[in-house]
Amino acid sequence: MNLFDLQSMETPKEEAMGDVETGSRASLLLCGDSSLSITTCN
């Protein structure tokens, strides 16, 4: 789950404070293990 941690750190905490927990998990599941899944799916 290193990708998840890296993506959470890359995402601005101000914008995605709550979305990091739910949004990134959903985007990882939907988009796969892409390093840009948060950016692409959000």
Curated annotation (Swiss-Prot):
Q: Which family does it belong to?
A: Belongs to the lanthionine-containing morphogen family.
Q: Region (Disordered): which ranges?
A: 1-21
* Modified sites of kind 2,3-didehydroalanine (Ser): 27, 37
Q: Which residues are removed as the propeptide when the protein matures? A: 1-21
Has UniProt tagged this entry with the keyword Magnesium? no
Crosslinked positions for Lanthionine (Ser-Cys)? 24-31, 34-41
Q: Does the keyword Cell membrane apply?
A: yes
**Protein name according to UniProt:** Lanthionine-containing peptide SapB precursor RamS
Question: What is the organism lineage in this UniProt record?
Answer: Bacteria, Bacillati, Actinomycetota, Actinomycetes, Kitasatosporales
Task: Give the species.
Answer: Streptomyces coelicolor (strain ATCC BAA-471 / A3(2) / M145)
